[in-house]
Amino acid sequence: NIGKSIKLKDFLFTDRFKGIAEDIRQKSTPDERHEYKKTKVHEIPAITISGLFNVRESKGLVSPSGLMCIDIDHKDNTPEIMAKVPSILKSLPYVCYSAKSISGDGYFAIVPIENPYHLRQHYLALEEEMKSYGITIDKSCKDITRLRFATYDDEYYYNPFASSFYLEVDITQPLDRKQSNQFVSSSTHSDEDRV
């Protein structure tokens, strides 16, 4: 499959996938929703949030977007935590967008990062930050080539002035796990083309 470049806002701010999302979410259990989603996968577009690629592999990176996308799934978190996820994400200054996944069983959030060439280190720091809220994020999100499937959520959250999440450690050095939770958020952005 040959991909094409699109504006992120055209992917996020649309109701084109409302019908598919509602069909998937009407299934009774998470397993049924997952299986049904697999049958519809050819109808659901997906993009790489973290960069533009000529081939979808790390060495095919043309330019990083400066954004990291994290997934928060029901299988990794308790129902009590999942109920709190939307309000927690909305409270974080570095979350610029969050919404339900297409199955409705999880959430994803888009976070601007200070150094897009060090996505993995930012992921590890954000993973520690989320643990402080009791949230486990999907480990596969540290992959810069990770796909994000389109979704529909009429209660999505958008903050065009989100700050960048960045590390206080020297990211030219290997990241020590003990330092991975040392972060700050700053660099307020209002550029709507970013999202």
PLM regions: where:
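DNA replication initiation modules
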Residues: 1, 54-77, 113-195
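DNA replication initiation on ssDNA origins
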Residues: 1-66, 76, 178-181
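Hydrophobic, Leu/Ile/Phe/Ala-enriched alpha-helical segments that form helix-helix packing faces
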Residues: 24, 28-37, 89-93, 126-134
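Short beta-strand
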Residues: 97-103, 138-143
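A generic structural motif
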Residues: 105-111
